[in-house]
Amino acid sequence: MDEGSEVSTDGNSLIKAVHQSRLRLTRLLLEGGAYINESNDRGETPLMIACKTKHVDQQSVGRAKMVKYLLENSADPNIQDKSGKSALMHACLERAGPEVVSLLLKSGADLSLQDHSGYSALVYAINAEDRDTLKVLLSACQAKGKEVIIITTAKSPSGRHTTQHHLNMPPADMDGSHPPATPSEIDIKTASLPLSYSSETDLTLFGFKDKELCGGSDNTWDPDSPPRKPVIATNGPKLSQAPAWIKSTPSLKHQARVASLQEELQDITPEEEIAYKTNALALSKRFITRHQSIDVKDTAHLLRAFDQVNSRKMSYDEINYHSLFPEGSQTSVEIPTDRDPDSNQIFASTLKSIVQKRNSGANHYSSDSQLAEGVTPPTVEDGKAAKKKIFAPSPSLLSGSKELVEPAPPGPLSRRNHAVLERRGSGAFPLDHSLAQSRPGFLPPLNVNPHPPITDIGVNNKICGLLSCGQKALMPTAPIFPKEFKTKKMLLRRQSLQTEQIKQLVNF
């Protein structure tokens, strides 16, 4: 296609005269008042047309002569057309030559201007492969104190090199090394290890994308070149070297917790387990029991004597407890040591309170003349039995078990064994005759059994077994008696305090 057909004159005589390189006609038009920077429909000025025209005939002149004349008549070299190109860009693009470029630069053409595609005059000169024009441009940049860096990256579909230029920047590393990878170029891969994982296979946790995805064009690998794709590989047996977020899973934590709990349970003996559960049951409830029936006439004296009367509590429980263990069935019970220091302190304080209350109650009964009349002096054998009973199992340890059984309603088991009805205030509990004599301050029972029942020690074991297993069972409130007691229901009244006796207690 002819170059003259590409230029749109649109009836503009000045642009048409410049396009045909008619210098005399151009002078006449300018002297006649034509506007020198008038543009056509593409935004091109007469100076741009003069830089890009290639029309040659007998009356035409050269480009440099036409450009020089227009610049002398105040043509603007920095005007840009609709595509953003200036006259200098058109001169470099159409290979106008170094003479035309020098004229434009001397007239004040700007080298830093860029079109809408981001290209400058330097880029167009490089793409046109015009070395002479490029030297002129570089000289002009150096004269202004600017450093030009040119990097050729690829070729366009037409075969020309697509270039980019950078001003006021240090030179890039052109030795062919791969640039540093950006976070968007990193490909993270995670995979779970199978059970039968081979030691020869590698699991890639981190990897970089291929070079061609980053803009590279060479896919071959050179052994002498530095590594471009660092890979962290791990084998199946080397799972311990993996990160903590891969190894630690909720299931593994749960298994470790169960294993440690089983080891702790194996260290606990059955006796310690019984002691734990017995203490928990004994300390979880506060039992309210009635220990004495008192005929009160003067409530004022009773209130004043209330603090001292409380010191005789628990003594009745101790005697009833010792009746369960005759002389022939005395056994030593080993008290398991609790691991909790608080429970040990509670146990020690309970023993001390029992001893103090028992001593105070015994002294009170021995000082009462009315209560000591029917008491016979104890024998030597009774004294030995009393000494043995002191070393019997602690009442505080097993009284809790007795009181745990006490609130249970009488079931078929208690009716079958004909257990004796027990009342705390007026105790119906059988007492040994020798025990009654060896304990001063207590009245002897009305019906004395010459052969005291021997309580089976298995009852205590049965109670502990049921407590340790956590089963709910009906147990009798008193030990099993021989057959001769089936038709007897003893109801014994211990004592009753009158107002005079309460006054004596206050003054005691």
From Swiss-Prot:
The modification Phosphoserine is found at residues 260, 293. The modification Phosphothreonine is found at residue 269. Belongs to the ANKRD34 family. Coiled coil: none annotated. Disulfide bonds: none annotated. GO terms for cellular component: cytoplasm; nucleus. This is Ankyrin repeat domain-containing protein 34B. Keywords: ANK repeat, Cytoplasm, Nucleus, Phosphoprotein, Repeat. Residues 361-370 have a biased composition (Polar residues). InterPro entries: AN34A/B/C, Ankyrin_rpt, Ankyrin_rpt-contain_sf. Transmembrane segments: none annotated. It comes from Mus musculus. PROSITE patterns: ANK_REP_REGION, ANK_REPEAT. ANK repeats lie at residues 9-38, 42-79, 83-113, 117-146. Phosphorylated. Induction: Up-regulated in bone marrow upon differentiation (at protein level). Residues 157-185, 361-380 are annotated as: Disordered. Specifically and constitutively expressed in brain (at protein level). The keyword Nucleus applies. It is found in: Cytoplasm; Nucleus. The keyword Cytoplasm applies.
